[in-house]
Amino acid sequence: MPKMKTKSAAKKRFKITGTGKVKAAAAGKRHGMIKRSNKFIRDARGTMVLADADAKIVKQFLPNGL
């Protein structure tokens, strides 16, 4: 059986923590900030932990746990 390859797109966007959770940047901060509330902009700063269902999918793209 061939070696499992890591999806390059997932490698650039997600990180797996030591406890196995998946971290990602918050969405919706590329443009159009003028119509967003200040609370949204503050909350979208930094990274967030994905939900379990989403994390399960992302972990399939990262077989080596990058």
Swiss-Prot record:
GO terms for biological process: translation. One of its GO terms (molecular function) is structural constituent of ribosome. Disulfide bonds: none annotated. InterPro entries: Ribosomal_bL35 (IPR001706), Ribosomal_bL35-like (IPR021137), Ribosomal_bL35_CS (IPR018265), Ribosomal_bL35_sf (IPR037229). Keywords: Ribonucleoprotein, Ribosomal protein. It comes from Brucella abortus (strain 2308). PROSITE patterns: RIBOSOMAL_L35. One of its GO terms (cellular component) is cytosolic large ribosomal subunit. Belongs to the bacterial ribosomal protein bL35 family. This is Large ribosomal subunit protein bL35. It holds the Pfam family Ribosomal_L35p.
